[in-house]
Structures are given as structure tokens and as C-alpha cells.
Swiss-Prot record:
Predominant location: membrane
Entry similarity comment: Belongs to the complex I subunit 1 family.
This protein's name: NAD(P)H-quinone oxidoreductase subunit 1
Subcellular location(s) per record: Cellular thylakoid membrane
The encoding gene: ndhA
Function statement: NDH-1 shuttles electrons from an unknown electron donor, via FMN and iron-sulfur (Fe-S) centers, to quinones in the respiratory and/or the photosynthetic chain. The immediate electron acceptor for the enzyme in this species is believed to be plastoquinone. Couples the redox reaction to proton translocation, and thus conserves the redox energy in a proton gradient.
InterPro entries: NADH_UbQ_OxRdtase_su1/FPO, NADH_UbQ_OxRdtase_su1_CS
Lineage: Bacteria, Bacillati, Cyanobacteriota, Cyanophyceae, Synechococcales
Domain of life: Bacteria
């Protein structure tokens, strides 16, 4: 099958077929990636918020959202509209510039990271050759926005929440990057498309989760910590810090923090799907499937079926992980700040280093299995 392609090429060729010049086609493409990212991210957040509220209600033997649309499906949209029209209050002693820039600096890197996520065989907004490196670089910007928001609020609870968020993010960013580096080493590429293609040779047996089980666990723990999900929600612990760095925020600025958090959760689940669970790949080989139905793999019908099911597989794997994250929220207690830092620096960091060294050794010893 064809490898994942850049949507820009398909769009440009389609516009040129209508008689427009290449320069005009490229100019028309410029705003589309961000539009696609915003639409997919917002839809992902709306679904995730609804799922979380319904699952949380089930865990507490409640009904949950019910009146806004069928089964309360429109409740997240109603909440967003409510926050949109609420008054935007800036504390009198706050730094108004940093207070405003902080939430934006938290949200923008998370949205930009969606550019590298391949949703299907031929559904990729930007096939960046260094996609993984770009994602790690963008994710390192978010703690600056959190610290800026906490500091600029001129509130002791906000400042403590911002400091906790920065410490937590730095502590878990390193083992997260080392876990991803082991995948990059096996795939010989920083491209998310190449990583998925490398996993789709023998069905689910070729998924990276079997060759990197330790890396998978490290990545998932670090991803939950980066998203500040329970049991790692220390920066906004209600019993200790009111709402952490969000304490003085209201209206749409307050909503931006939650929007960034849920977008980051869905993004992390998608990246786990791409890096460890074969992305758009099926549990069975597509070659075996095409031979089973008696059609060539190059048959247009097989290509359409594979592309459509590939998108479904990517989203299904991601939302299974989102479901797991929501369950963890209601089944695990919050850790203390010293336990959180000890887990990152004394446990996950050494294990991720050992995992990287073992992966390098196995790559040399078994190049066919570990991508030599």
C-alpha cells in the first residue's frame, strides 16, 4: 500500500486541475492546516468531555448530562458557550500582559502538535520528517505558560500551582523523551508516518508495544503526568491550592486551560496509538485480508476500505486509552508532591535510560527484529 502522504500535495494538485496556478494553490492551502487542526481538536475535546462526565457519573451511580441534546451530548458545547459569555476579570494587582499571554502560551503548542498526527493511511496534515522532535520541542513550551499564569496572578495559591506544574512537567519530560527515543531508534526515523509503517508488516504482532512494553508504560505514565490527570493533578489540587494556577482566572481564559488539558489528553492517546499500537494498522495484515476476500491489494475497493477502517482504528485505539485515563481518575488517589518527583527522577528516569540502552543492544544483536 502507499505510504502516508502529505495532504498539501493532494490539495495542490486538485486545485491545479481546476486551472489555477501552483502559487495560488499553495496560498489557498496556508490557512487550511490550522483549520483542520482546530476542527479535529475541538471535536475530540467535545467527545472527551462528554465521555468523562458520563463515565464519572456512572462511577458515582449518577445519570450525568441528560437534557442538553440526546444523552446530554451537547452539554460540553453548552458549557463552552457559558464560559464564552462570562465576564473576564483581571485581578487589580496582577500583571495583565502575562496574565493574558499565559493561557495562550499553554494552548497554542498543544494545538500545533496535532499537525504531526497521522489519522489514517493518507490522512496527515503535515508529513514533517522530524515530527517527533517537533512534538517534544513544542511540549517543552507549555510549562512556561503555566508558570507565567501562576506568577502573573499575584496569588500565593496560583504561584504554588505554577511552580508545581513547571516542576512536574520538567520531571516527566525527560523519561518521556527517552521512551520515545527508543521507538525512534528502532524505526530509524523521526517521522510519525514511518513509525506506523514500520509496525504494519505482520499485523498486531509487529506493533511496538510487544518490543517496547517498558517504554509503553513509561510513556503512558509520563503522558498522564504531562496532562495533569489524577493521580498527578498536583498543580491544581483543590484541597490544597483552591484551583492552582487557574485560581484567579474566569471566563474564556479559564476555559483555555481546560481546553488545552483535554486536547493534550486526546493528543497523548493518539501518539500512544501511533507509536506503540500500530496507528492506522489492523490487528491482521492487510495483505492477508486482501487475499482472504480474493482481491488485489492495489484494488481501489481494498484501498478505500483500508483507508476508512484505518481512520476508525486510530481513533478507536486512542479513545480506549482516553477511557482508561478517565477510569484512573476515579480509581487512584492523588500522590504527594515528593512522591511525584521521586517517581519521575528516581524511578522512571533510570528505567527509561536502561530501556534505551537495552534497546540499542537488542538492535545490534537482532537487527531484523529491532530495526537494524
Amino acid at each position: 500500500m502507499n505510504s502516508g502522504i502529505d495532504l498539501e500535495m493532494s490539495f495542490t494538485q486538485g486545485v491545479q486541475n481546476l486551472g489555477l496556478s501552483h502559487e495560488l494553490a499553495h496560498l489557498l492551502w496556508i490557512p487550511l492546516p490550522m483549520l483542520l487542526v482546530l476542527v479535529s481538536a475541538v471535536i475530540g475535546v467535545l467527545v472527551t468531555v462528554w465521555l468523562e462526565r458520563k463515565i464519572s457519573a456512572a462511577a458515582q451511580q449518577r445519570i450525568g448530562p441528560e437534557y442538553a441534546g440526546a444523552l446530554g451530548i451537547l452539554q460540553p458545547m453548552a458549557d463552552g458557550l457559558k464560559l464564552l459569555v462570562k465576564e473576564d476579570i483581571i485581578p487589580a494587582r496582577a500583571d495583565s500582559v502575562l496574565f493574558t499571554v499565559g493561557p495562550i502560551l499553554v494552548l497554542v503548542p498543544v494545538i500545533l502538535s496535532w499537525l504531526i498526527v497521522p489519522f489514517g493511511q493518507n490522512l496527515l496534515i503535515s508529513n514533517v520528517g522530524i515530527g517527533i522532535f517537533l512534538w517534544i520541542a513544542l511540549s517543552s513550551i507549555q510549562p512556561i505558560g503555566l508558570l507565567m499564569s501562576g506568577y502573573s496572578s499575584n496569588n500565593k495559591y496560583s504561584l504554588l500551582g505554577g511552580l508545581r506544574a513547571a516542576a512536574q512537567s520538567i520531571s516527566y519530560e525527560i523519561p518521556l523523551a527517552l521512551a520515545v527515543l527508543a521507538i525512534v531508534m528502532m524505526s530509524n526515523s523521526l517521522s510519525t508516518v514511518d513509525i506506523v509503517e514500520q509496525q504494519n508488516t505482520a499485523g498486531f504482532l509487529s506493533w511496538n508495544i510487544w518490543r517496547q512494553p517498558v517504554g509503553f508504560i513509561i510513556f503512558w505514565i509520563c503522558a498522564l503526568a504531562e496532562c495533569e490527570r489524577l493521580p498527578f493533578d498536583l498543580p491544581e489540587a483543590e484541597e490544597e491550592l483552591v484551583a492552582g494556577y487557574q485560581t484567579e482566572y474566569s471566563g474564556m481564559k479559564f476555559a483555555l486551560f481546560y481546553l488545552a488539558g483535554y486536547i493534550n489528553l486526546v493528543l497523548s492517546a493518539l501518539l500512544v496509538s501511533v507509536l506503540y499500537l500500530g496507528g492506522w494498522g489492523f490487528p491482521i495484515s492487510i495483505d492477508w485480508f486482501s487475499s482472504f476476500i480474493g482481491l488485489s491489494i492495489d484494488n481501489p475497493l481494498v484501498q478505500i476500505i483500508a483507508a476508512s477502517l484505518g481512520i476508525v482504528m486510530t481513533i478507536l485505539k486512542a479513545y480506549l486509552l482516553v477511557f482508561l485515563a478517565i477510569l484512573l481518575r476515579w480509581t487512584t488517589p492523588r500522590v504527594r508532591i515528593d512522591q511525584l518527583l521521586d517517581l519521575g527522577w528516581k524511578f522512571l528516569l533510570p528505567i527509561s535510560l536502561v530501556n534505551l540502552l537495552v534497546t540499542a543492544s537488542l538492535k545490534l544483536a537482532f537487527p531484523m527484529t529491532f530495526g537494524g
